[in-house]
């Protein structure tokens, strides 16, 4: 059976119903310009949205203490849902709203991701709801519960001019690169940078294979060695090369993972608001 290449992607947008994310909608709007999408909004109560972020952010198991007295403004929730559907209509985007959950919210969202191509979350909400002490643990555990790839989008999202692909030779990093390539063919003409950590080896793992894989989708690609004692080099590259998107696998506790946590997540992703695409298998 041959799959029709012009299929409609199903995109999940998980958001706190009391806050509308301009960045998330801009991302979906840009996707729809390249290929039709079905935007499925999952409107969660504030308390459930915070729990979703904590759980998908990989916070250690245990009780989450959230103010039970959070006031939910039903009028504001309805206004934001109406705003979302109206904007979708104005931009020719097929959309649905799911806000009637019969299961525990995390089980429901995980089930939704099983039948979706991509989950989109506002990185602004993510960082506002995670304390400083938990942000450094983000990459190792990010969104392991999702059954589809995930992208964290900043509020000032712009279509990237450059794609950075984090590579450590692991199957997870290769899987993330492949998933990104499948989902975003419109980015194949962008400048791509394969980044790996120089641990004293003469070459990167499986060089011929990874070059063949990337060159087939991203003809304008180059390789960047990130030296162990030069993490700031990567930050400087991000700052000096315009709008950038980072592609990463769900790394284990490798050296690359430790470097990403300390340099990318806390400094680059937070302060410079770079969108990050994460996929795991």
Feature roles, as predicted:
Residues 2-7, 46, 82-119, 217-246, ...:
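Structural beta-alpha unit
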Residues 273-281:
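Short, flexible loop segments at boundaries between secondary-structure elements
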Residues 95-152:
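Hydrophobic alpha-helical segments and helix pairs
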Residues 13, 121-122, 165, 248:
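Redox-cofactor binding/interface segments in oxidoreductases and associated redox assembly factors
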Residues 43, 123-124, 249-251, 280-281:
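Short secondary-structure boundary segments
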Residues 2-64, 145, 158-226, 243:
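Small/aliphatic-rich secondary-structure junction motif
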Residues 63-78:
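A short acidic, glycine-rich active-site loop
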Residues 152-158:
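Flexible loop/hinge segments that line or gate small-molecule binding clefts
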């Amino acid at each position: 059976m041959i799959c029709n290449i012009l299929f409609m992607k199903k995109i999940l947008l998980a958001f706190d119903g009391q806050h509308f994310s301009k960045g998330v909608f801009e991302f979906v709007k840009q996707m729809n310009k390249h290929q039709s999408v079905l935007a499925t909004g999952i409107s969660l109560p504030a308390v459930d949205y915070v729990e979703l972020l904590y759980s998908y952010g990989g916070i250690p198991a245990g009780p989450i203490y959230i103010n039970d007295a959070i006031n939910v403004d039903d009028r504001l929730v309805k206004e934001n849902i109406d705003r979302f559907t109206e904007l979708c209509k104005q931009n020719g985007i097929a959309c649905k709203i799911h806000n009637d959950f019969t299961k525990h919210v995390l089980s429901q969202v995980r089930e939704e991701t099983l039948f979706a191509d991509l989950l989109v979350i506002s990185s602004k909400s993510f960082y506002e709801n995670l304390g400083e002490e938990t942000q450094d643990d983000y990459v190792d555990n990010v969104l392991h519960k999702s059954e589809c790839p995930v992208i964290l989008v900043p509020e000032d999202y712009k279509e990237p001019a450059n794609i950075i692909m984090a590579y450590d030779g692991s199957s997870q990093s290769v899987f993330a690169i492949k998933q990104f390539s499948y989902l975003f063919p419109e980015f194949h003409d962008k400048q791509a940078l394969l980044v790996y950590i120089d641990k004293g080896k003469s070459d990167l793992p499986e060089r011929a294979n990874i070059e063949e894989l990337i060159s087939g989708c991203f003809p304008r690609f180059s390789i960047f060695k990130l030296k162990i004692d030069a993490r700031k080099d990567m930050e400087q590259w991000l700052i000096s090369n315009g709008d950038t998107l980072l592609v990463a696998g769900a790394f284990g506790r490798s050296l690359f993972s430790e470097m990403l946590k300390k340099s990318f997540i806390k400094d680059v992703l937070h302060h410079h608001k770079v969108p990050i695409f994460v996929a795991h298998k």
